[in-house]
Amino acid sequence: MTWRHHVRLLFTVSLALQIINLGNSYQREKHNGGREEVTKVATQKHRQSPLNWTSSHFGEVTGSAEGWGPEEPLPYSWAFGEGASARPRCCRNGGTCVLGSFCVCPAHFTGRYCEHDQRRSECGALEHGAWTLRACHLCRCIFGALHCLPLQTPDRCDPKDFLASHAHGPSAGGAPSLLLLLPCALLHRLLRPDAPAHPRSLVPSVLQRERRPCGRPGLGHRL
């Protein structure tokens, strides 16, 4: 075997190895590209699924909520399944239930469930949240209904007495001012030129009790 045969053999082996290497790299690139495409498709589907559910089922949820009657239960409970106890309709008087959590009330109706009719108000000219005095009770207007506190003046039923009781309340604030005046008066007595030397003599004489006999009136007892 001549040297030419050896060269041809080496050339053939190297060419075969290069072809095998190119084939393996092509297979790896193809496999990685397929995995990336699958991942992208799965990600796009995952992102689109909540949006599709929201757009397609929002009308169904709101429409089914509008169709419930005042005495009809919900078809099923979202939290506990079919075996849970049914709850009544969330909105009244033609209100629209949005996502099962709050109501959009029509005109002249208010409240959490549109249960209060503003045209049938017990408050008269009072607005929502206003206070008034009615039959010796302090009342507040809440959604067209009066809610009264217990009786404020048990023995008197005159609004003037009720107002007077509140007017005399702040007078108790004058007690601290009187307590501040007492040290000032004592200090003034001490600074006077004719002030006594002993502090016990500062006590007014009106506070000293006189000694009197404890016997019956008309009978004189000597001390």
UniProtKB/Swiss-Prot annotation:
Domain (EGF-like): residue spans on this chain: 86-115
The keyword DNA damage belongs to this UniProt entry's keyword annotation: no
Principal location class: secreted
GO biological process, any: heart development
Gene Ontology cellular component annotations, sorted alphabetically: cell surface; extracellular region
Keywords: Developmental protein, Disulfide bond, EGF-like domain, Gastrulation, Glycoprotein, Secreted, Signal
GO molecular function, one term: activin receptor binding
Record-linked Gene3D superfamilies: Laminin
Subcellular location: Secreted
Disulfide bonds: 90-97, 91-103, 105-114
InterPro entries: Cryptic/Cripto_CFC-dom (IPR019011), EGF-like_dom (IPR000742)
Signal peptide coordinates: 1-25
Glycosylation, residue list: 52
Family note: Belongs to the EGF-CFC (Cripto-1/FRL1/Cryptic) family.
Name the UniProt record assigns to this protein: Cryptic family protein 1B
